[in-house]
A protein has these predicted regions:
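Structural motif corresponding to alpha-helix initiation and N-cap regions
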Residues: 39-43, 67, 94-96, 118, ...
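Residues that scaffold the ATP/ADP-binding catalytic core of kinase and kinase-like folds
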Residues: 20, 24, 67, 96, ...
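Residue-level signal for mature regions of secreted extracellular proteins and peptides
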Residues: 10, 14-17, 230, 250, ...
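Membrane-interface junctions of multi-pass transporters
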Residues: 261-303
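Residue-level marker of regulatory loop/turn positions in helix-turn-helix DNA-binding domains and
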Residues: 2-6, 240, 291
Length: 303
């Protein structure tokens, strides 16, 4: 049976990043600049994605602003008819560059938040002055009128500041904040011993989010991504493997999800060699866990 079309695509434009966040989920072996897809190759990827049925495009990294051709890439996404969201730390952006991205057709900005105070944010990000730069860029985002989402990655060291992070997002004029407890993949897994929150911290975070949702109803949408470590079952992910979204790595490798390479034995195809529609429909990695036919009994027949 032919799978339904994907709705969203994550385009990891680069693994380069000026920050050094210990919770980064990128792989330990990063793609070099010389192996990255060119702007022309990304434009072709966007055309193929739109033809496949993709509606939403998320430009990520690394730090996508590390690419000098980011404006050209955004223009290509607009030409393909994709709703385009930029996921960024803000470092590498400027008022002029944001204006150029606006003119190129960028629809939305998702700004990461390492902390609500300069000392903590700059220490976590490993970039002196990064918090001040982020505030400047946030003000410019608001001035231009981009819809804004704040992405707050929470861990042992900043979870006590969660109420301030939520109010900070509201003060910036954000429409949404994603409160995401660290997902331990890539570099985050290597640093898990330092980042893992306590059960008490996670329970308090749940109460904080519930209260904030009542307080900010109609002003600020609040998403909460808990860690799996204190749950009886892992949370469902993206409505099922190979069902609603796909990722393209900086070198053109096509993945069912960001963490798919951590699963041994999967074979991933590359956009430089195989059409995106063929990868989505018939690719071995996408077919491996799509649907329920791969499940053993009694799981497969369980209601």
């Amino acid at each position: 049976m032919t799978p339904a079309a994907p709705i969203a695509m994550l385009a990891e434009l680069t693994h380069r990043c000026p920050l050094s966040c210990p919770y980064c989920s990128n792989p330990l072996e990063l793609t070099s600049r010389h192996a990255e897809l060119t702007a022309a190759e990304w434009a072709e990827a966007f055309r193929q994605a739109a033809a496949l049925g993709v509606l939403q495009l998320h430009l990520s990294g690394g730090e996508p602003a590390s690419r000098p051709d980011l404006v050209e890439i955004v223009a290509a996404a607009r030409a393909a008819g994709l709703y385009t969201n930029l996921i960024t730390s803000g470092i590498g952006l400027s008022p002029r560059r944001l204006a150029d991205l606006d003119a190129a057709g960028l629809d939305h900005v998702q700004l990461s938040l390492q902390g609500v105070r300069a000392d903590i944010a700059d220490r976590i990000g490993g970039y002196r002055g990064g918090f001040a730069r982020k505030l400047q860029i946030a003000a410019e985002i608001a001035r231009i009128g981009f819809p804004l989402t704040i992405n707050a990655v929470m861990h042992r060291h900043n979870l006590p500041d969660l109420p301030e992070a939520i109010s900070f997002a509201a003060d910036l004029g954000a429409r949404r904040i994603e409160v995401a407890c660290v997902q331990f993949q890539g570099w985050a897994l290597r640093n898990r011993a330092s980042l893992q929150p306590t059960r008490a911290q996670v329970e308090e975070a749940k109460r904080t989010v519930a209260q904030a949702r009542r307080e900010y109803a109609g002003r600020l949408a609040i998403d909460f991504v808990p860690p799996d470590y204190f749950s009886d079952f892992p949370k469902a992910c993206m409505s099922g493997w190979g069902s609603t979204g796909l990722n393209i790595a900086p070198d053109g490798k096509v993945l069912p999800c960001h963490a798919a390479e951590t699963i041994p034995g999967l074979v991933f195809q590359n956009l430089r060699e195989t059409a995106l529609a063929d990868i989505w429909t018939h690719g071995p990695a996408f077919s491996a866990f799509r649907g329920t036919g791969w499940l053993p009994e009694p799981c497969q027949s369980c209601e």
